[in-house]
Amino acid sequence: MNVLHENDHSKGAFYVEQDGQRKAEMTYTWAGTDRIIIDHTEVDDELRGQGVGYEMVFASVQFAREQQISIVPLCPFAKSVFNKYPEFKDVL
């Protein structure tokens, strides 16, 4: 599963496309220059249960580590993933 990323420095998204259509998306907004707030995660029914949501959260963690920023997971799904993976605490 290839997770793509768009970022315009005020908001952004990690997403998955299939046949040229966005089938999953996790959106965020920037809070200053050193923090993003994950506010929503959505996965089309046809991709549910395949770990796509997890892959988008994992991509956000990699991005945060590379950029040396922190994440505030307001989205209930993202928050649940962060709770399951204590090794992600470094970006919270």
Q: Could you describe each region identified by the protein language model?
A:
Residues A59-L92:
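C-terminal structural segments of small proteins and small subunits
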Residues G12-K23:
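Conserved beta-hairpin
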Residues L47, G51-M56:
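Conserved acetyl-CoA pyrophosphate-binding loop and the N-cap/start of the following alpha-helix
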Residues R35-D44:
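Conserved acetyl-CoA binding element of GNAT-fold acetyltransferases
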Residues D19, M26-D34:
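A conserved beta-strand-loop-helix scaffold within acyl/acetyltransferase catalytic domains
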Residues N2-L4, E25-Y28:
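Short, surface-exposed charged micro-motifs
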